[in-house]
Amino acid sequence: MLKRFLILLFIVKCSIANAQFNGALPTYKIQAGDNWVKAKNYYLLALLQQDKQAAKLISADEGLSGIGKNKLQALKSSLVDCKDGLCLPAALKFTDDEIKLVSDRLAALYRPGNALDRLVKTNLIPSGTYNFFGSDDPSALLVKAWQQDAFALNFAIGVYAEGKKPNYPLIDSISFDVRKKAYYTLMYDCSAEVAANTHNNALFFEPALNAALTYLEINERVDAGNFEPMATTVNKAAVDKIAGTKWGSFPYTHILVPGAGPDNLTTPLSGEGMLRCKAAARQYFAGKAPFIVVSGGNVHPYKTKFNEAVEMRKYLIAKLRLPASAVIIEPHARHTTTNLRNDARLAFRYGMPFNKPGLIVTDKSQNDFIMNMDKRCLKELNYVPYKLGKRLSETELEFFPLISALQIDADEPMDP
């Protein structure tokens, strides 16, 4: 009787957690396959490639296979017909009509219990990566996830092949001058590489997907995959420690330290970054939290080889004597908005209590900015990935992570 009661209680708790997180599960592991850049930017497409039954289903559809053949033929024709660099990548992008046709075909193919249904329910929903679209209608979620991935492919091709402006041109722009003759040669060679790497029976989206990944690589913009899988490598010691942490002994789950990039290419860690680490270390040693999350990517200046999170971790351990198992790196964020978003993702994936606050420790100026950052989040992310708590001092600010943070950002391929 007791055993039956405990099983029922477990099921109820799981159901409550499932509803609370819009279907996302903290135990879910991202199925990255052999390419984290692909999985983090275009998760539905990555899953379709990995799931043999789902791939078979969409390959057998005449409408979808027809689009794939047309895209591959357009790619091959562009190598003969295109006389300027911009013409070549344009052939690989999806048109609005193609996106709609794929949407219609996916909706028609979806059936309860089939491969697409299983993919949505066992991967898309528990991953939380498309939770902005809800989980009540799996068929609609599949279509919206496709539309987001198609937009993301077109965006990456537009910025890193056609030279269109990214959201932050000073740090995220294309690496090449589209006005120079060498640009045409480079684009031709990219298209030739994509054609050689895409077989005749490819899935309908693979020419565009291979192109986007190729353009990101030649621009040295594969930051999204750096240090992955973090939970089993650079953050393993901390992740292992989280499982046995007595959370009731601390007022906060962790301390978040946003990075501050230097203003030159030779300085690993800025003075501001050092000061933020010192302030965070004081709070750690005062027993405020069992972990410090240092957040920041390879951001400032343009094309820097130094990573903010990595350099802060080194400083905390070597200079401030924190145990390595207490420092978690979040090495991808490129803005303050994504410092908080990515931190929330790690807190969820690593199993920290989501109903307990974290503590931001930074300088007065940045905390002033964070206090009014919700509008910036809505503009750039379409959601706010946190809820603020009390401002304890000029340098300390409470916050609660929100599950919305798991949503992929389709127009930031270096940190989606």
Q: Where are each of the predicted segments found?
A:
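Bacterial Sec-dependent N-terminal signal peptides
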Residues: 1-20
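A structural signal for short, hydrophobic/glycine-enriched beta-strand patches
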Residues: 20-416
